[in-house]
């Protein structure tokens, strides 16, 4: 089954907040995920830089760390959400603002924009996690309950699904969303990135 780009968010098997992201692509498979101190980025592989002139949607920050929060998305709205949170906007409104403003991608497939934000704390009263999607018919932002993990994809059910996210470290999380568990059922995996909070946010990646 091909579901396009996938993100997962919530708490992992150890009760640690995490985000994970996978590129699945039929048209532009020559991409990689690069990790930095406070972000992970999707970029063309060396020799395929010209691809950005064919499709401006293929390179972006897929993960950003701002304050105590991790932001994950399938496009440039990662930065919009991060900027709004840095300015003091709450998580729900930051996701809704970015999805409403940028809307679905204006490509041949009307690719939906998906996004999520999770706080670093594992204290129930302080924990916050939201996931959202904007397609050509709707915009949804949903709160994810404490202790749960979910995933959502661009061409899947258009609503989040629960998942047992059995990965402990950031690198393990990137590998898990690439081809572990239920994600092994989804085709055309290209690259993946993730962040897991273990006293601090750690960013990982997987490039096959």
Curated annotation (Swiss-Prot):
Molecular function terms, GO-annotated: IMP cyclohydrolase activity
Swiss-Prot/TrEMBL keywords: Hydrolase, Purine biosynthesis
Reaction catalyzed: IMP + H2O = 5-formamido-1-(5-phospho-D-ribosyl)imidazole-4-carboxamide
Any one GO biological process: 'de novo' IMP biosynthetic process
InterPro entries xref list: IMP_cyclohydrolase (IPR010191), IMP_cyclohydrolase-like (IPR020600), IMP_cyclohydrolase-like_sf (IPR036795)
Enzyme Commission identifier(s): 3.5.4.10
Pathway annotation: Purine metabolism; IMP biosynthesis via de novo pathway; IMP from 5-formamido-1-(5-phospho-D-ribosyl)imidazole-4-carboxamide: step 1/1
Pfam family name, one: IMP_cyclohyd
Record bears the keyword Transferase: no
Protein family: Belongs to the archaeal IMP cyclohydrolase family.
HAMAP family: IMP_cyclohydrol
Function: Catalyzes the cyclization of 5-formylamidoimidazole-4-carboxamide ribonucleotide to IMP.
Protein name: IMP cyclohydrolase
UniProt gene name: purO
């Amino acid at each position: 089954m091909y579901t396009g780009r996938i993100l997962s968010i919530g708490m992992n098997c150890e009760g640690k907040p995490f985000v994970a992201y996978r590129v699945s692509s039929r048209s532009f498979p020559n991409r990689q995920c690069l990790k930095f101190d406070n972000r992970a980025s999707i970029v063309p592989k060396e020799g395929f830089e010209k691809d950005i002139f064919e499709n401006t949607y293929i390179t972006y920050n897929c993960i950003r760390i701002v304050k105590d929060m991790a932001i994950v998305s399938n496009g440039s709205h990662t930065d919009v959400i991060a900027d709004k949170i840095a300015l003091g906007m709450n998580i729900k409104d930051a996701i809704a603002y970015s999805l409403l403003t940028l809307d679905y991608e204006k490509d041949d497939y009307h690719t939906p924009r998906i996004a999520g934000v999770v706080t670093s704390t594992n204290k129930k009263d302080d924990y916050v996690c939201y996931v959202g999607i904007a397609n050509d018919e709707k915009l949804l932002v949903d709160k994810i309950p404490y202790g749960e993990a979910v995933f959502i994809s661009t061409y899947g059910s258009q609503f989040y699904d629960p998942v047992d996210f059995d990965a402990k470290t950031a690198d393990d999380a990137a590998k898990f969303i690439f081809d572990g568990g239920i994600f092994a059922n989804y085709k055309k995996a290209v690259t993946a990135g993730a962040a897991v909070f273990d006293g601090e946010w750690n960013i990982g990646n997987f490039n096959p």
